[in-house]
């Protein structure tokens, strides 16, 4: 169920923001697909390319939530700074509104502590992005190199049975096969043969058992890369999910701090929030704060 939920989240992300982000990420990995293939590559859950995008897209999504939390944090700070600059907080302890001012000071201290904890999360996000990009870049370089080697081997194999099949046709067919057959999460023999069948179906050729075995052997290096990708996905998925929960928690906590501060300020007999300045301070807050919740 967790895998389905995570995939639904990415599907919603892709449907909302289209293919541009995905194309840019694949471009960083020196992977370029024709427009008609990229839509399939990023929208079909079984696709190798969809798996490759999983962590980078999650990092982008987490980054948006973290930025929203940061915007709330900054706004809460501005509310308190304007209040402190007004001189309201320095009134005599026995003057009207003393209890409210004490509560506002408690909120200020909590906000400082929360901000320190949030900064640690921002650093954790930066480290996660750097480490995951380095690992996925290495896998992508290996994939691109081994893909070309494999295509040359397959080209030689198919030439022996059908000289009309061109290397470019094999490339397109193999990419389509890796889009439709999930060899990242399931490297069973059944799945491997399904991939070979998809490859030959796209090429519109019929091959015997011996040639199938030869094709399978020549694909072994690509299978190893997919296995390495799966290992890294397991590692980074745990980290991105943990970070996601923390980011959403901070966003909620900062939002709740804002509500409490505003309600406390309303109780003060003399100090009021400046509507004009508040409108300026609120400008960065017009976003969908349910992002990452669905």
Swiss-Prot record:
Gene Ontology CC annotations of this record: cytoplasm
Coiled-coil regions, chain positions: none
Keywords of the record: Cytoplasm, Protein transport, Transport, Virulence
Cell compartments where the protein resides: Cytoplasm
Record's keyword annotation contains Nucleotidyltransferase: no
InterPro entries in the cross-refs: DotZ-like (IPR049719)
Reported consequences of knocking out the gene: Deletion of the gene leads to a reduced intracellular growth in the protozoa A.castellanii and decreased levels of effector translocation. Deletion of dotZ results in the absence of both DotY and DotZ proteins in the coupling complex. Deletion mutant shows significantly reduced DotL polar localization.
Pfam families: DotZ
Keyword Transport: yes
GO BP term, example: protein transport
First and last residue of the signal peptide: none
Role played: Component of the Dot/Icm type IVB secretion system (T4BSS), which is used to inject bacterial effector proteins into eukaryotic host cells. Part of a subcomplex which recruits effector proteins and delivers them to the core transmembrane subcomplex. DotY and DotZ play a role in effector translocation, but are not essential and do not influence the stability of the subcomplex main components. The DotY/DotZ main function is to optimize secretion by modulating the delivery trajectory of the IcmSW module and the localization of the machinery to the poles.
Subunit organization: The T4BSS is a complex nanomachine composed of several subcomplexes. This subunit is part of the Type IV Coupling Complex (T4CC), a subcomplex composed of the DotLMNYZ core and the IcmSW-LvgA adapter subunits, linked by the C-terminal tail of DotL. Six DotLMNYZ hetero-pentameric units may assemble into a hexameric nanomachine, forming an inner membrane channel for effectors to pass through. Makes significant contact with DotN and DotY, but engages weakly with DotM and DotL. DotY and DotZ are co-dependent for the assembly into the T4CC.
Protein name: Type 4 apparatus protein DotZ
Organism: Legionella pneumophila subsp. pneumophila (strain Philadelphia 1 / ATCC 33152 / DSM 7513)
């Amino acid at each position: 169920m967790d895998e389905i939920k995570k995939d639904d989240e990415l599907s919603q992300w892709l449907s909302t923001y289209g293919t541009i982000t995905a194309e840019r990420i694949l471009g960083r990995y020196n992977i370029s697909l024709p427009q008609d293939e990229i839509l399939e590559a990023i929208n079909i859950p079984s696709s190798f390319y969809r798996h490759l995008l999983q962590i980078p897209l999650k990092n982008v999504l987490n980054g948006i939530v973290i930025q929203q939390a940061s915007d709330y944090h900054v706004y809460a700070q501005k509310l308190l700074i304007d209040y402190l600059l007004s001189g309201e907080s320095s009134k005599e302890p026995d003057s009207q509104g003393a209890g409210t001012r004490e509560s506002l000071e408690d909120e200020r201290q909590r906000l400082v502590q929360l901000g320190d904890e949030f900064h640690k999360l921002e650093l954790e996000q930066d480290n996660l992005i750097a480490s995951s990009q380095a690992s996925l870049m290495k896998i992508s370089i290996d994939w691109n190199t081994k893909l070309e080697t494999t295509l040359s081997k397959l080209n030689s194999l198919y030439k022996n049975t059908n000289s009309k099949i061109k290397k470019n046709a094999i490339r397109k067919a193999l990419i389509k096969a890796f889009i439709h057959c999930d060899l990242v999460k399931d490297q069973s023999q059944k799945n491997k043969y399904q991939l070979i069948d998809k490859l030959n179906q796209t090429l519109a050729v019929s091959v015997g058992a011996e040639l199938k075995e030869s094709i399978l052997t020549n694909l072994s290096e690509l299978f190893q890369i997919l296995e390495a990708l799966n290992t890294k996905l397991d590692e980074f998925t745990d980290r991105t999910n943990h970070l996601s929960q923390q980011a959403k928690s901070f966003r909620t906590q900062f939002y709740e701090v804002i509500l409490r501060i505003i309600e406390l300020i309303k109780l003060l007999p003399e100090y009021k929030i400046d509507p004009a300045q508040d409108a300026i301070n609120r400008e960065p807050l017009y976003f969908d704060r349910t992002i990452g919740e669905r």
